[in-house]
Amino acid sequence: MITVCALIAAFNEERYVGQVVRGTAAHVSRTVVIDDGSTDSTAARAREAGATVLTHERNLGKGSAVRTGLTYVLAQPCSHVLFLDADLQHDPGEIPKLLDRAEHGVGDFVLGEREFARDAMPAARFHSNVIGSRILSRFIGAEVADSQSGFRLIRSALLRKVSLTGRGYEIETEMLIKLVRAGAALERVTVRRLQYEGARSKIRPFRDTFRTCMLALAYRYFPGES
């Protein structure tokens, strides 16, 4: 039986964070929200829903929020850490798919890959994800179809072996690279991507794809320094 702490980085997500926390809490031992300098009621909504809330006084970026959260959750008695977004792009109802794969598969690193219809998202975002995922797959030697997905379940002991430095969304790629290099057996499950009113990704497709490519190249040609 695995025990799970959920880590949710949030920036100005008062509209959906409570719903995400409540949906997540049904499947995990503890839910931790990192309020990354929000100027709205994100922290209050998360607390009302039952989450432990850690707060940045100003916006430092998703990577910084994830690293703050990891410092906290890796000190808790949890065998795995679940990562998901606060904006409802990741359906908490899909969490059991990741848990089941962790319990009955290898269980090191389970990546929730979203179902994408080409016409269901902006072209720039779609193509940036495809290109970034193909490049990353080639350089790490493991097939990845959705490298930008932050929906993932990872063994705590493995996370303690790596040092993450990313401040922005590139931390998703950095995590994949460093954990695979540390020996993680990567497993993938297909998860439903929610469509909701007012959906707007904070990812900048061209900038973040460039960073993905640079990280992959650094891993390939300078493995001791990346």
Language-model segments: which ranges?
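Short hydrophobic beta-strand elements that form part
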Residues: C5-A9, V32, T55
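Short, well-formed alpha-helical segments that are part of the catalytic scaffolds
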Residues: I8-A26
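Acidic helix N-cap motif at the loop->helix transition within catalytic regions
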Residues: R15-Q19, D40-A49
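A conserved acidic beta->alpha catalytic loop
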Residues: D35-A44, L88
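Acceptor/aglycone-binding surface of glycosyltransferases and processive sugar-polymer synthases
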Residues: E57-A75, P92-Y169, L194-L217, Y221, ...
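A short, conserved alpha-helix in the catalytic core of glycosyltransferases
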Residues: L158-V162, G168-A185
